[in-house]
Amino acid sequence: MKNKRKKYFYDTIEKENIDWHEHKNPIVKLFFRLKFAIAIRYADLKKDDLILDFGCGDGWLKKILPDYNIIGYDIDPKLTEIKDYTKLKPDKIFALDILEHMKKREIRKIIKSFKRMNPNFKLVTIIPTETWFWRKSRKLLGLSETVKDHITKLKDTLQILNEELTLVKKINFLAVTHIAKWKK
């Protein structure tokens, strides 16, 4: 019985391009949808906002917000809608589950580029906490406790963000994810 349940709930092995928002495990699916819902609420979106989805991946944000002007940028040329995101003047920028994949100097460079693009922008971030609870949660899902391509820890990322921007509000969602809104 345990193996059947494990297969049903944890049949996804860690690999690139997992669509977490449509995951077979209903708990995983709910978690990813809820944290994105919080991020969207934090953004206080308006219909006339120009929104940059930085690190858009498969464009899930645009799929769930079709009535908004969202431009997706990703380093994968197959996924990006714009080659040079710095040409935009976005009102809102989402960097959801992406900053931890970058080196500290890259994060700082990107935040500085955001500040040059529009002095009045708002940034919404989602960053995994990578705490003991986060690691054990991953293990329960049949995944490795660490992610090989997570380069920068939450503490270091927050230090950069606090040096470059002003924190508007934050929440540590279920102790595994840090969601925040920032302004210049």
Regions found by a protein language model. Give the residues of each.
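Conserved N-terminal segment of class I S-adenosyl-L-methionine
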Residues: M1-L88, K92, R108-I111, E145-Q159, ...
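Hydrophobic pocket-lining residues within nucleotide cofactor-binding pockets
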Residues: I75, I98, I127
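A short beta-strand submotif of the Rossmann-like class I SAM-dependent methyltransferase core
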Residues: A95-I98, I107
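A short His-aromatic
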Residues: H101-M102
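Generic recognition of short, well-ordered alpha-helical segments
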Residues: R105-K109, R135-K136
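A short glycine-rich, Lys/Arg-flanked "PGG" loop and its adjoining helix->strand segment in the class I
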Residues: R108-F121
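Conserved beta-strand signature within the Rossmann-like core of class I S-adenosyl-L-methionine
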Residues: N120-P128
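Short, glycine-/aromatic-enriched active-site segment of Class I SAM-dependent methyltransferases
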Residues: P128-K148
